[in-house]
Amino acid sequence: MRVAGGRALSRGAELRVPGGAKHGMCLLLGATGVGKTLLVKRLQEVSSRDGKGDLGEPPPTRPTVGTNLTDIVAQRKITIRELGGCMGPIWSSYYGNCRSLLFVMDASDPTQLSASCVQLLGLLSAEQLAEASVLILFNKIDLPCYMSTEEMKSLIRLPDIIACAKQNITTAEISAREGTGLAGVLAWLQATHRAND
């Protein structure tokens, strides 16, 4: 799978990011109900198991109505700040010290694409995020959908967005519920937050 001007990953592919970004936090953003909380919980599980073993049933979640800080520890500790989708109007208050951004979209719900695209464009145009590495995650690939992920990317003109953005952007298809692609997300986070000693 290829994306003009950016990087794309097939399911389970390895994510690579060049170093050089400033130290800081990872922001986890996306509309309400896209699976951000489950993603963070699953990333914790994957990092604690070193990517081995079955993840089992997904843990219970509820919509985030504020902010959650979660530490992911593998080769080094990475703090992920998850902001609830309902907090979209004030996300910009949390952009400072952001080294990386995980933006989650629901691949099973094409009707939500336009709203997610508007949010993404707002993030990419923010000066405070100009140097942040961005990973756009198409979550819920385990659920049936009448559009393929490639059709969704084309519909929101993602290749054009990536070509015009200041940020280094990578895309991936994942299933937080099943664990598909999460080892790659963890590897991307580790590479992005590599210490500059």
Curated annotation (Swiss-Prot):
UniProt entry keywords in alphabetical sequence: Cytoplasm, GTP-binding, Nucleotide-binding
Subcellular location: Cytoplasm
Substitution effect: residue 37 to N: Loss of the inhibition of RIGI-mediated antiviral response activity. Loss of GTP binding activity. Loss of interaction with RIGI
Protein's gene: ARL16
Designated name of the protein: ADP-ribosylation factor-like protein 16
Single GO molecular function: GTP binding
Keyword set includes Cytoplasm: yes
InterPro entries: P-loop_NTPase (IPR027417), Small_GTPase_ARF/SAR (IPR006689)
Gene Ontology CC entries for this record: cytoplasm
Subunit structure of this chain's protein: Interacts with RIGI; this interaction is GTP-dependent and induced upon viral infection; this interaction suppresses the RNA sensing activity of RIGI.
Gene3D superfamilies: P-loop containing nucleotide triphosphate hydrolases (3.40.50.300)
Keyword Methyltransferase: no
Family: Belongs to the small GTPase superfamily. Arf family.
Residues that hold GTP according to the record: 30-37, 82-86, 139-142
Function: May suppress the RNA sensing activity of RIGI in a GTP-dependent.
